[in-house]
Amino acid sequence: MSNAALATAPHALELDVHPVAGRIGAEIRGVKLSPDLDAATVEAIQAALVRHKVIFFRGQTHLDDQSQEGFAKLLGEPVAHPTVPVVDGTRYLLQLDGAQGQRANSWHTDVTFVEAYPKASILRSVVAPASGGDTVWANTAAAYQELPEPLRELADKLWAVHSNEYDYASLKPDIDPAKLERHRKVFTSTVYETEHPVVRVHPISGERALQLGHFVKRIKGYSLADSQHLFAVLQGHVTRLENTVRWRWEAGDVAIWDNRATQHYAVDDYGTQPRIVRRVTLAGEVPVGVDGQLSRTTRKG
C-alpha cells in the first residue's frame, strides 16, 4: 500500500488500542507479534504507529532474537547500526545493557547523524529492573504545532548539523570513564556529520516535526552561543511533559516508535539492577524539509 493510502485509508481490522497519554502513545492488546503475523494486522499496526507515534505490546515473552528480526521484516527493511556491532548470531539486533554503561539517558532520535536514518525502531525488553528504568517518548510533531507562529516560521528555515562525535562525558558524567571511552571508540569508529532540516515533513502523514536531539552539533548559520540558545528553545518544546508518554517496562514488552516524529529518553534511575533491551531499526527515507530540500551527509570517515 502506498504512503498516501496508508495515511488515509480505513482499515478493516480494528485493533484493541488503548491510548496511554493524551498526545502520544498507545498500548495494543490481543496481538501476538511474530514473523507469521497476517497482512491485515500488520497494516493496522503500521497505521496505529503513524497515528500514535509509539505503540506498546505487553507480554511478548515468546519472542527471541530471530523472531524479533523476522517480525521486523514485516514492517520494513531491517538495518544494523552503522558503527556498533550486532548481537552474536543476529544480523540486525543492537543490545543496550545498563551494566555496561549503555544507558541512553539523554533526549535523542535514533541515528540522526546519518542521511537516511531509521524510520522506526522495535525495542524488546529482555531483562527489566524491579523498579526504575522507564523510557519516555516525546511527540516532535505536536511540539512543532504548539510553537508560536513566528517561531514556526523560523524553524522552517533552519538546518542543523548532526554528528555521532560529541561530548559524551558531559552527557554521562556518572559512567565509569573507562567504560565510557570504550563505548565512544566503538560509537565513533566512523565519524558522521549530516545536515538535516530542523523541520522535516513526514512522508506518510504529511505532518511537520522538529528534528533535533542530542546528535545536533550546531545550527547552521549561527554562532555557537546563538545556536545553543536556539536549540534549547526548540528542544524545550519537544520535551514538555504534555508532549510525552512514559512506559514502565516488564520483561517481554515490545515498543515500536516512529523515529521520524519522536525523541526518546531512557531514564537512568535503576542503579545496579540489570536492564537489557534489544533493538531492531528499519531503513528510513532521506528527510525532506519544508522547502523540499533533502538532508545531506557532509562527512563520513
Swiss-Prot record:
Gene Ontology molecular functions: 2-oxoglutarate-dependent dioxygenase activity; metal ion binding
Needed cofactors: Fe(2+)
Reaction equations catalysed: a primary linear alkyl sulfate ester + 2-oxoglutarate + O2 = an aldehyde + sulfate + succinate + CO2 + H(+); 2-ethylhexyl sulfate + 2-oxoglutarate + O2 = 2-ethylhexanal + sulfate + succinate + CO2 + H(+); decyl sulfate + 2-oxoglutarate + O2 = decanal + sulfate + succinate + CO2 + H(+); hexyl sulfate + 2-oxoglutarate + O2 = hexanal + sulfate + succinate + CO2 + H(+)
Function: Catalyzes the oxygenolytic cleavage of 2-ethylhexyl sulfate (2-EHS) in the presence of alpha-ketoglutarate to yield 2-ethyl-hexanal and succinate, the decarboxylated form of alpha-ketoglutarate. It can accept a wide range of alpha-keto acids including 2-oxo-valerate, 2-oxo-adipate, 2-oxo-octanoate, 3-methyl-2-oxo-butyrate, oxaloacetate-alpha-ketoadipate, and alpha-ketooctanoate. It can catalyze the cleavage of medium-chain alkyl sulfate esters such as butylsulfate, pentylsulfate, hexylsulfate, heptylsulfate, octylsulfate, nonylsulfate, decylsulfate and sodium dodecyl sulfate (SDS).
Protein name: Alpha-ketoglutarate-dependent sulfate ester dioxygenase
Binding site for 2-oxoglutarate: T135, R275, R279
Domain of life: Bacteria
Keyword Oxidoreductase carried by entry: yes
Family to which this protein belongs: Belongs to the TfdA dioxygenase family.
Residues that hold Fe cation according to the record: H108, D110, H264
